[in-house]
Structure formats: C-alpha cells, structure tokens
Amino acid sequence: MEYRGEEGRPRLEVGLRDIPNGPLSQKTRPPSSSSSMVTRTVLSRALRSATRSPRALRGFATAHNAYPITEISTLPNGLTVATESHPHAQTATVGVWIDAGSRAETDKTNGTAHFLEHMAFKGTNRRSQHALELEVENLGAHLNAYTSREQTVYYAKSFRKDVPVAVDIISDILQNSKLETSAIERERDVILREQQEVDKQLEEVVFDHLHAVAFQGQPLGRTILGPKENILSIKQDDLSSYIKTNYTADRMVLVGAGGVTHSELVKLAEKNFSSLPVSSNPIPLGRLSHPKTAFIGSEVRIRDDDLPTANIAIAVEGVGWSSPDYFPMMVMQSIFGNWDRSLGSASLTSSRLSHIISENNLANSFMSFSTSYSDTGLWGIYLVSENLMNLDDLTHFTLREWTRMSIAPTISEVERAKSQLKAGLLLGLDGTTAIAEDIGRQLVTSGRRFTPQQIESAVDAVTVDEIKRVAQKYLWDKDFALAGVGSIEGLLDYNRIRTDMSSMIY
C-alpha cells in the first residue's frame, strides 16, 4: 500500500502567512511577444488535432491498426470501462480509478481516504484477510492500492487467464469490506508509524507545507494521511460515510491493459459492478465537482539549525490537467530539469541553471516540477543546499532564469527540452500497469485519453514564442508560494525574493 502524489512518486502532503501587497502591489509590465498570438493559434490547432481519433499510418496493406486503441464504454449505472488490449500479452493490469481522494474530505475527516485504503485488505464479507492474501498469492498476482489528493486507486496485475478473478477481488474489496473495529484499531497504529516515517523525509515535509501555504484553508492544502488527531479519532462510521458518498459508479473508471479484451472487461463489469450506487447529482468525468481552488502567494519557514541543509520549495500557480497550457508548461519545466551534484558534472547537462549553480557551488541538488490537479497546479523548483551563506544567490539566480523565459528562451534549449519530455512521457508507458495508470488518471481528471501519438504531437507544437507566452502569463511578476525547512537563516525575506520575479537583467 502506498500514497502517492500526482507526479507518480510517493508524496504526502501543510503554514501560513499571507504576504501583504506593500510596495510590490504596483506591477511591472512583462515584455511582450509579437508572435505569441500566432503561436497560440498553431498550438491550439495542434491540440484540437490531437484530440481527434488517431489514424493508423500505412504504406503497405496491413490487417490491424498500427497502434493499440483505447476503447471506452459506459454502463447504465454510469461506470466507465476502458481498455487498451495487447493480443499477445500474457499478463494484464486491471484496476478501479475513483474520482475521490483527500480533496473529498473535510478538516474533521481528513485522512479518511488513506485510512480506508489500508482497511481494504483486511477482509470482506466473502473473504477473510488470510483467505484474500492466500488467493492473491496462489494466483501469482500483485494487488495494491494508493491514495492521492484527487484519486483513490485499487489495481491488480495477473496472468490474462486470471483477469476474471482479479476483477472479482477488486469488486469485493470496494463493495464488501468489513471495516471491523478491531482491524481499525490495529491499522491506526500502522498509519501512525507510517506518518512518523514520512515526517523524516524532508522533501515530503517541504511539499506538504508548500501545498498548505499555496492552497491554505482549502481541500488541496490538506495532507493525505491527515493530522495525528484525526488518525486517532477516525471511526467505522467515518469510513462507511466516505464510501457511501464517494464510491459511486459515475465517479469510477474500470481500466484494463494488456491481455484483456474490451468485451471481456465490459462483461466482467456488468457482473461485478452493476449494483454500485449512483451519485444523487452525477457529474461527468472531467467536470469540476468542487469549487475552484484559489492560489495564495504566501510562505512558511521552519528553521531548524540542527539540520545541515536548507530545503526550499518555490512555486507559482500552475495549470490543471485540461488546460491548453499544460504541455507548454511541461516543456518549460523540462528546460530547467533536475540536477544533483553527486551524480556528475553539470557540464554534461543542458540546463543553464545547473551550470550556474554548479560553477558557484550554490546547491547540492534541485528538482523542477509541474504538478497538476483538476483545476489548478503548482509549477516550481525544490532546492537543497548546504552552502548556507549564499542562499540569497541561490534564489536570485534561480528566479533570474525563470524571468529569462519571458524574454529570451533559446531555440536549442526548447527543442532539447521537448525531446527530453517526450522521452520521459513515452518511456514511462512501458508495461501494462503504467498504461492502466495513464488511462485511469486521464479519464478521471479530463474525461478523455491522449494517446502517445497525440502527446507527441502536442509537445512538438510548442515553440519558443509559446514558452515566452506562458512564462509571461504564469511567471512574470507573479506571487509565489514558498516553503523552507532546515538551516534557512540566510534566506531573504519574501518581498526581497519577490523582486526577482520581474527582473530585466538576465
């Protein structure tokens, strides 16, 4: 079992000072780009083209499609069934993606979704915990689940002949879990130990605080595990209420990838999921079912001089999954990339920022990120440095490179970033579990699925002028959220750092 952030790696999620406008309330006008309107038209045309059904490329006659096709059906109760079949695959991944995570909780019930994920493997009305574990082991299958801010996922990987059993097990877990009081008490201690382990991981702690300040007082600002007091107080009624409210057919997608046909999975869905309830007010997948989240320029600093490093995350408001600026923002993030001093010379990397930081010994590592949710996102960078006397230079040169994107990104770095992004996105679809994850996430968040070919076309359509446009829109002279943990005495105050968001010197 695991809980994961929206970038696919394990991620927990916390405040707290709004920044007054002060002298920075008078905005500096960003540099203009004369050809941005033309570029936006070209990109929009490419994105519209990418959403059309893919056409098989053919020179000579062929008896089958060149690429696997994602087939989608909807049952009468609203459950979506999606498959990408590979006829020669001997294994398959099947799973249920639910449009509900910690974002569907309240302050009082925060942590329920993750707690429920833990309880899923503790026995059902048909299978005891031991019988469930033994059945999965005898199949040679892999059964897992994870919770994120916006999704809860239960999936299994098995031999293709065992797909019916795998679907039956997942259905049983979702609809018939016992939620016994004794099991709840045992799992409470497990989750508390898990929370202690996560609190030791500085990166996770910083990103929790970053979400808390950027989306403070709102569902996205809460952690996935929930606060300790909630973990200690969650009861059976809380878990049952969450299931009743969120585990409805119209908010679920049953996904199959690999050795499973669409017709087979539809029949299995009809057999195992037809009795799922429907929301009182069904909302189509990809449509917002909650109020728009507001991004707040603010900061939190947790100084601990016993830590040898400063751990700092800075982020502006990013874009949601369905935004037309999603791929340009991903390309811009790829321009900065990641760097770690322990992995080799910066002279071998393409990022200008990595050269600056390496040559001046400003940081141990950095990681750029573009995290998307259904209606908003976080775009930024995570910095780790033991050069505590030069934290002001570290933030200055980092934000100076950000502002350069509004003025003078180069063709070579944009093209290189596009190639790296395509490689990362497409190579990440290796294996049935990765494909199922991609299908489920896209359908839940946007109501559709971009094929690998459509993704490649959308990335290829991003130009230098498009990078300038999104940089001017999302970076230039914008408020940011900042979270710092560790030896951060040398970190300048918010307003001083904020001035670098509109510097004409690069």
Where do the protein language model's features map onto the residues?
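Histidine-acidic residue clusters that define the catalytic metal-binding segment
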Residues: 61-72, 212-252, 273, 286-292, ...
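M16/MPP (pitrilysin/insulinase) zinc-metallopeptidase core fold and M16-derived inactive scaffolds
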Residues: 88-157, 335-339, 343-362
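N-terminal amphipathic/basic-hydrophobic helices that include classical n-h-c signal peptides
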Residues: 1-36
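An aromatic/glycine/proline-enriched structural segment found at the starts
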Residues: 61-63, 216, 220-232, 248-325, ...
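Acidic/histidine-enriched segments that form metal/cofactor-coordinating
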Residues: 38-60, 98, 124-125, 129-246, ...
